[in-house]
Amino acid sequence: MSTSIARGGWSDLTPSGRALFDAVLLDRDGTLIEDVPYNGDPEKVRPVPGAREALDRLRAAGLRLAVVTNQSGLARGCFTERQLRAVHARVEELLGPFDDWQVCPHDDADGCACRKPAPGLVHAAARALGTTPTRCALVGDIGRDMTAALAAGATGILVPTPVTRPEEVAEAPTVARDLPAAVDEILRRMRAVRPVAPRAGRAGTVLVVRSDSAGDVLVTGPGIRAVAAGADRVVLLCGPRGRVAAELLPGIDEIIEWPLPWIDSNPEPVDPQDMRRLTTRLAAVAADEAVIFTSFHQSPLPLALLLRMAGVPRISAISDDYPGSLLDTRHRVPTGIPEPERALSLAAAAGYTLAPDDEPGLRLRDSPVPTGAGADTAPENPVAGLPDDYVVVHPGSSVPARACPAGRCAQIVAALVADGRRVVVTGGPDERDLTARVAAAGGIDLGGATDLAGLVRVIAGARCLVVGNTGPAHLAAAVGTPVVSLFAPTVPFGQWGPYRVPTVRLGDAGAPCRGTRAAVCPVAGHPCLAGVEPAEVVAAVRLLAPPD
């Protein structure tokens, strides 16, 4: 267990649904102060440049601060607890007070649950500060810090130093050049999801748009809920691939399904008559305004033109391109921020924010979350008959470049079974051959046996989900199931990884396909995911879902 040095005064503070973060957790050596190995001498404490000013900005923003630090020098006899307290007193003398200190006094051989990369210190600090890990940002200088943050569900920001390995930089969800820049990032992201000025009153009917895959619709959920919190009626325009996900989202009163040829991955030729029918259908909504949600590589302007022709008086969207008179609110965001926050920032720019009791994570409408694997034995319940304690492996993906090779997935299933895990393999109706192959080593094959709502129930009942960058990863985030993310680096992990849920990222983050947005792997052998060792997955599952 960790050693906690906590201050009182936070018992009356509860998490607010209007803010992204309640607290910032900071590594000590290399992040707050210069790294002096096994230091027990207060006179050797040297803050990193700009540390005091950066921390004071966090304090001024109302954020609680805690230090989470591995100090194996205690276990090794390099310094005493008294010397450690003296060092920490000097840190506070130079940098100001911290609301909590969480110290792991063990070394790696002890096998404790607190030493980073384990998430124990993060959980302990969040509890001491009266919040949860998902409402914390963690700033550190090495991969252990980022792994601990992700495994707890916190937001990780890496500040590299000369000792940070290149692969740790590549794997980090967010990288800042120094501590002040990390603070800039935290405060910017907090400001981005808050409206500059509150709306004068509730909106009437608002048309929201998110046309793409099921996963894209799911990560837009927080933005849609923000609009719904300030509108009398919300109508969603989505494409055929996103319809099933849209039906699971709260805050939507009506769904219009219509493929958009400038968005769909396999578009039909533009049909003028179809565009006229769409314009007529949009006019029939009689929307008071529209909010067009898109991904960073998509343009809202073609649809904005149709909406103007349909008589929509106010339109908001993210657009780097000059919109002319097509947009009333032209919003811009930097690349790399998580997609749910991107959607929330657009909603905020349009004047909407989440309800005070609503968290900014992913959420489903009336999510069919079982209370136990045997809680509902109805035949239509896909969880009925499954073991009481299982791990899900989902090998498929709508984008081939993001899928772990089937042979490797089969080896992963075999390794998990050998570790004593009960494994359920899931997939769509067109993936039955894939799931049968992957499950052959001892898994339970549910390929093609569930619709999306059924898949939600299976994932919600699992201890952990092993999956690539595809829709089920976002379903897991929405129901709180930890994720072992086999993440191909074709798109940024910090933008598209599982959001605010305990996660371990695996795969070669520096592979040649990095940042290509390739749909089909451009590198022979798919090395970014084919190189994931089954033992790595077993260890990741153990970290996220320790055996009973």
Task: Set out the residue ranges of the language-model regions.
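Active-site neighborhood of HAD-like aspartate-dependent phosphohydrolases
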Residues: 4-66
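Short, solvent-exposed loop/turn segments at secondary-structure boundaries
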Residues: 43-44, 77-82, 112-116, 267-270, ...
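Substrate-recognition element of Asp-dependent hydrolases with the DxDx(T/V) motif
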Residues: 51-88, 97-110, 149, 425-426
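Catalytic machinery of carbohydrate-active enzymes
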Residues: 69, 192-548
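Structural recognition of alpha->loop->beta junctions
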Residues: 87-103, 167-187, 250-259, 439-444
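Conserved Lys-Pro-Asp/Glu-containing loop-to-beta segment of HAD-superfamily phosphomonoesterases
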Residues: 113-149, 287-293, 459-467
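Acidic, Mg2+-coordinating phosphoryl-transfer loop and its flanking beta/alpha structural elements
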Residues: 137-174, 483-487
